[in-house]
Amino acid sequence: MTVGLGMPQPPAPTLAPRRATRQLMVGNVGVGSDHPVSVQSMCTTKTHDVNSTLQQIAELTAAGCDIVRVACPRQEDADALAEIARHSQIPVVADIHFQPRYIFAAIDAGCAAVRVNPGNIKEFDGRVGEVAKAAGAAGIPIRIGVNAGSLDKRFMEKYGKATPEALVESALWEASLFEEHGFGDIKISVKHNDPVVMVAAYELLAARCDYPLHLGVTEAGPAFQGTIKSAVAFGALLSRGIGDTIRVSLSAPPVEEVKVGNQVLESLNLRPRSLEIVSCPSCGRAQVDVYTLANEVTAGLDGLDVPLRVAVMGCVVNGPGEAREADLGVASGNGKGQIFVRGEVIKTVPEAQIVETLIEEAMRLAAEMGEQDPGATPSGSPIVTVS
């Protein structure tokens, strides 16, 4: 029942339109406002260890990574790029610092793009013409990756520290040099470890150019801290239409970066939602062990790549309502659980059978969804909500 209060209904919440950008192709992945926001990560292996690097790329691909970056600090790493680029399932970007000759090695190796750091490549300004010519001939884009920790000393001297203005001016200066040589397939990042400074830098940059932007909070920290920093910064920017690719930088296995990145995009409806688990934080009203129940359901549905919302609720306050709103859910109490499927109670089971029943029903619903849309492409990990 709807109660009218004589007030206009607010519009449905939506994000700001994507900021209009020029379009690039990184391998087979489109980048820019005409394409979905993509998730990137970076290998932690030694690039010259080809087998280990390709194994990690395969793991990242399976986790939903769209583009992968590899380090190239030595000649032996540069020598390995061709084989890695040839066998990788997703586009490979070479990450170049200090030595400009590795830029040309990466281009010759068939990498899908090259990231250059103008702050630490010796005499980079004087080599831009050569880089632009080689990249243009190969048809690959260049990412100008400015980082607060390695900002060009000219801009450090001018601004005193890595301010948003310093980061943006450094990036646009280098972009202008490429443009002077007729090369415009450019993507830019201006990373900082402080999310507030990072957001300000990207807002300033977005207002001053039409290049696609790669978002990142650099050196974000361990998994928990880095996840919070990245989610806050990405949410602030993406909700305003700013950002075309993202990389969550964590002191954690790179697969975790991809999981967080995908979840950020799903949370903003910028990527099709996968399995979602909704669960309550628990309180004194809970009549079951919500933590254990939620974790067991999540583990049992791991890898089920269908857009199901599963609600696991611990009491009768919000439990029935949340369970009815989900595709599948349980409202628990008094040692038992009411199982809901698409808003209807289908059975009541003992507490010991809740997890097993939810998993069985989730598998059944997933099979039905597959029959209705056999060509559907899995889009991530299941989401389970426990309340």
Curated annotation (Swiss-Prot):
Please state the Enzyme Commission number of this protein. 1.17.7.3
The answer to whether keyword Protein biosynthesis applies is no
- Name of a matching Pfam family: GcpE
Question: What's noted on cofactor binding?
Answer: Binds 1 [4Fe-4S] cluster.
Q: Which cofactor does it need?
A: [4Fe-4S] cluster
According to UniProt, this protein's pathway is: Isoprenoid biosynthesis; isopentenyl diphosphate biosynthesis via DXP pathway; isopentenyl diphosphate from 1-deoxy-D-xylulose 5-phosphate: step 5/6
The Gene Ontology CC terms held by the record are:
peptidoglycan-based cell wall; plasma membrane
Binding positions ([4Fe-4S] cluster): 280, 283, 315, 322
Molecular function terms in GO for this entry? 4 iron, 4 sulfur cluster binding; 4-hydroxy-3-methylbut-2-en-1-yl diphosphate synthase activity (ferredoxin); 4-hydroxy-3-methylbut-2-enyl-diphosphate synthase activity (flavodoxin); iron ion binding
Q: Which domain of life is it from?
A: Bacteria
Supply the alphabetized keyword list: 4Fe-4S, Acetylation, Iron, Iron-sulfur, Isoprene biosynthesis, Metal-binding, Oxidoreductase
Class of this enzyme: oxidoreductase
Q: Name one GO biological process term.
A: isopentenyl diphosphate biosynthetic process, methylerythritol 4-phosphate pathway
Residues annotated with N-acetylthreonine modification: 2
Swiss-Prot/TrEMBL catalytic activity: (2E)-4-hydroxy-3-methylbut-2-enyl diphosphate + oxidized [flavodoxin] + H2O + 2 H(+) = 2-C-methyl-D-erythritol 2,4-cyclic diphosphate + reduced [flavodoxin]
Q: What does this protein do?
A: Converts 2C-methyl-D-erythritol 2,4-cyclodiphosphate (ME-2,4cPP) into 1-hydroxy-2-methyl-2-(E)-butenyl 4-diphosphate.
Q: Family assignment?
A: Belongs to the IspG family.
Please state what the protein is called.
4-hydroxy-3-methylbut-2-en-1-yl diphosphate synthase (flavodoxin)
Taxon lineage: Bacteria, Bacillati, Actinomycetota, Actinomycetes, Mycobacteriales
